[in-house]
Regions:
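Beta-rich carbohydrate-recognition and catalytic domains
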Residues: 1-86, 94-147, 151-205, 213-263, ...
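Conserved active-site neighborhood of enzyme catalytic/cofactor-binding cores
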Residues: 269
């Protein structure tokens, strides 16, 4: 494990595999993690299973629990058919201050490139019921929205939302991150772009925030970036910083990649512990083109 001057840099070769893909080869993924520390001290993890196009795509979101952050027990599995969607992407799992849980589910509208975000609420993560789903981020005819990163801080919900333009059907892979706020985590006010692509750089095609850390000197974020349309779904990880949550500036990167396959290391999520330690979760490409889900622990800085 290395550390930049901002955030820990993952080392997939020494990390522990949390979940293997359910098939071999390109398009078979276990990943898109969203980690949360529960009031019981356990780690709760939402993630996504995917098959290739034509075989189900993102067919399930899973919620699991672990005492040690490495060995997980599945609590509930959410099937894409229960949401009437073509595919599920990375969920956002959050513990609600004062009690209760939410999972924000990214749903692909059948036959289109459009995405929306639904939310499920429950007293505990075993009780999520798709029949109670309601759409909180519908997107529109111009923009598909998915993969929210949601954080409660100082009495306000903060969100970093991945946006895809739909104006050019052959270029819907382009992406940027928009910032939003909410007093209740349900009704959102969307603000300006928090992080966009960097022309001519490794993230010129897209920039998607995957995890945000509040630091003494501002806000720090991991994000996924890609240079070309051909790199879609095989992103690398970079770091961005800002004095405001709604304006993040990319640092030179990428900072992390897989040593196997396409080199993709993406959707990094983390849990920060009270003692300053941190546990990372991320999706990593493998030699055969599949992706697995890995974790590693980062001890407190000295």
């Amino acid at each position: 494990m290395e550390e930049t001057d901002l955030l820990p840099v993952p080392d997939p070769a020494s990390a522990i595999v949390v979940q293997e893909p359910l098939g071999k080869g390109p398009g078979h993924w276990a990943g898109g993690p969203s980690a949360a520390l529960g009031p019981d001290g356990a780690i709760y993890l939402g993630y996504r299973f995917r098959r290739p196009f034509g075989e189900g795509r993102g067919f399930a979101n899973v919620v699991a629990r672990s005492e040690d952050g490495e060995r997980f027990e599945t609590l509930v599995t959410l099937d894409r058919k229960e949401f009437g969607c073509e595919s599920l992407e990375r969920p956002a799992l959050v513990a609600v201050p004062g009690g209760g849980w939410r999972i924000y589910v990214s749903c692909a509208t059948p036959g289109t490139y459009h995405w929306r975000v639904d939310v499920l609420e429950a007293s505990d993560p075993t009780s999520f019921d798709p029949r109670s789903a309601r759409t909180v981020l519908p997107g529109d005819e111009h923009t598909g929205v998915k993969d929210p990163v949601i954080l409660w801080h100082e009495g306000l919900w903060h969100m970093w939302l991945c946006c895809h333009p739909l104006d050019e059907p052959d270029h819907t892979d382009r992406m940027w991150t928009r910032y939003g706020t909410s007093v209740d985590g349900i009704d959102w006010d969307l603000h300006d772009t928090a992080l966009g692509p960097t022309p001519g750089q490794w993230d010129a095609r897209g920039a998607r925030v995957s995890h945000v850390v509040v630091a003494d000197d501002g806000w720090r974020a991991y994000y996924d970036g890609r240079a070309t349309a051909e790199d879609n779904a095989e992103e690398l990880t970079g770091v961005a910083v800002g004095t405001s949550p709604g304006h993040l500036v990319a640092r030179p990167g990428p900072v992390a990649a897989s040593p196997w396959g396409s080199g993709s290391l993406r959707y990094l999520s983390g849990v920060e512990f009270p003692d300053g330690g941190m546990r990372l979760y991320y999706e990593t490409s493998l030699r055969d083109g599949a992706h697995d889900l890995r974790t590693e622990y980062v001890p407190p800085s000295r």
